[in-house]
C-alpha cells in the first residue's frame, strides 16, 4: 500500500542563480520538501536524487543511467527550453514526464542579444575599445568597416526567435535570408568577416573544471559571451517560476503545461493499466 503521508521531495540538481528563494516559496507552499545540489556528473545526480519525486535541472546531465537509478521520480523539469541534458526516451520508458519552459520566456532577450553581437562585430566595438584603452586613438583601428544598410543577414532557421531577430535587423536596413543554400554560399565563399557567439561547443557551465583553451578565443574577429543571451531579471524569474510550478503541478496530480513527452507517457501508462486490468481476476 502506498504511503500517502510521506512528504514528496523535489531535488534541484544544479543552478547558478545564487539562491533558490523563488523555487522554495512555490515548492514548500505546496507541502513539498526541497533539496538543492550542484551536480556536475551523472553520479552526482544519482547520489542527490535517487529517491526524489521530482528533479529540476539547469545544466546537469540526467541521462539513461541516472534515470534508471531513480526510484520514485515522476517528473524531470528543465530550467529552459532545450531538453538535450535529459534522455527523454529513457524517461519515457520509465514513465517519467519531462517538462521544459516554452521558448517565449526569453524570445526578446535572445533577439536583442543577437543584434548586440551583430552590431558589436560589424562596428568593431571590441577592437576599438581595446585599442582606446591601450592609448591608441585612431579610427583606422577598425578598418575595414562597411555600412549595415543594404547588407545581408543569414539565419540558420526561421522560428520565433529568428523572426524576432529579422524584425530588428530590418530596422537597420539589412536584407534577411533564411535559405540554407544562400547561407552556405555566404559561408563557403568567405563573405562572413566576423562572428558573435553566445556559447562554445564545450559549454563550460556543464564542466567541473574549465580553462579557456578553445581556439576561437584567439581570434580578434569573434565575440563570445557566456551563454547569456537569455538573461534579463524578468526572464530569469519566469524560467524559475515555471520550472518549479511544473513539478508542483505533477506532484499534486495536475497536468503539466509543457511536457515534451506527455503524450508518450500517457499512452504507456494506459497500456500498463490495460495489461493490469486484463490480468485481474474476475
What are these regions, as identified by a protein language model?
Residues 5-6, 21, 29, 136, ...:
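Rossmann-like dinucleotide/phosphate-binding beta-alpha-beta segment
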Residues 53-129:
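Phosphate/diphosphate ligand-binding glycine-rich loop within oxidoreductases
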Residues 34-40, 57-58, 133-141, 182, ...:
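Short gly/ser/thr-rich secondary-structure transition/capping motifs
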Residues 1-52, 268-282:
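N-terminal glycine-/charge-rich "phosphate-binding" loop or analogous flexible N-terminal tail
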Residues 99, 177, 181-282:
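Rossmann-like dinucleotide-binding domain for NAD(H)/NADP(H)
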Residues 20-21, 39-46, 60-64, 85, ...:
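Structural motif corresponding to alpha-helix initiation and N-cap regions
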Residues 48-49, 67-70, 148, 216-217:
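A short, aliphatic-rich alpha-helical micro-motif
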Residues 111-130, 167-174, 241-254:
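Oxidoreductase and adenylate-handling cofactor-binding alpha/beta cores
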